[in-house]
């Protein structure tokens, strides 16, 4: 703000500005892991293995993602999730339309597929009924658009000094925090971590 002579140095825009406690040890470790992966993938001796490892990782991520939701995916759901993961290679910037497309891919039930971000309140609950069963109440629908605009601006920004693994975690967690759809948010959040890493190279 020029009026107040304050330099905003937050992670992300005002609409979505998470706070992260930085640790030199954690940052160092994250960079080491990324460097080792990059070195391995760039080695010509591993050229034939890269595709095999990616295919294994995609299949493993698909099954694990459904296991987190306590589901065993039917073959059509497995194929849909794999297709969504393969779309991440396109490195498209996040937008509401793109997220709706991804949600429609991972949610195979036409009744639960979305056309836009939610316009009603949702919540997560464990077994039981009533308010005591609610374990998370996402932001109200009136705030979803602004929060998602901020989150998408953070996700799409290619510059900045946020380490890639930290940014991927922020995008993934932020998506679950906002919970912009009535269904599929958990699966999409796991896809968005990978999307964030692919955008950052």
Predicted features by range, described:
Residues 1-201:
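FIC/Doc superfamily catalytic core
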